[in-house]
């Protein structure tokens, strides 16, 4: 199994999309790319820690490649808006790829170039080495699955899931 860490707005959105993808073993919402140790949601939302809301994805590279994970990333958020996704505004919502290896860095940079062909505005996604990943509090994990009737889930997360379903990427079978 390999890992990928990505930030593209609220971690609930990326978590919900990647949990559907065949070859993804687990998705953990958390914080990365900041300056303080052991951040919590309140401190991250204050903007003082420098962390981004991210997801750490454990995947089977025999089923899905890192490059394919990045392709899903580009359709799951707007990488052209700085420190913002829709109404979610702040440094914690920035688009970022904290890479785990030099090979991931290379693929991230190639993926940005390829994705840039599909956006009219420049991509502002940061690419930097993952120094530390801190899992978010338990109530943030599996958010869409445990709160499907919550308004944010209905109006923000569900459209991103629907967009993913239209791509033709493989979706996990029910119960897997």
From Swiss-Prot:
Transmembrane segments: none annotated. HAMAP family: MsrA (MF_01401). Its EC number is 1.8.4.11. The active site is at residue 10. InterPro entries: Met_Sox_Rdtase_MsrA_dom, Met_Sox_Rdtase_MsrA_sf. The keyword Oxidoreductase applies. It comes from the Bacteria. GO terms for biological process: protein modification process. It comes from Leptospira borgpetersenii serovar Hardjo-bovis (strain L550). It catalyses: L-methionyl-[protein] + [thioredoxin]-disulfide + H2O = L-methionyl-(S)-S-oxide-[protein] + [thioredoxin]-dithiol; [thioredoxin]-disulfide + L-methionine + H2O = L-methionine (S)-S-oxide + [thioredoxin]-dithiol. Keywords: Oxidoreductase. It is an enzyme of class 1 (oxidoreductase). GO terms for molecular function: L-methionine:thioredoxin-disulfide S-oxidoreductase activity; peptide-methionine (S)-S-oxide reductase activity. Belongs to the MsrA Met sulfoxide reductase family. This is Peptide methionine sulfoxide reductase MsrA. Has an important function as a repair enzyme for proteins that have been inactivated by oxidation. Catalyzes the reversible oxidation-reduction of methionine sulfoxide in proteins to methionine. Disulfide bonds: none annotated. It holds the Pfam family PMSR. The gene is msrA.
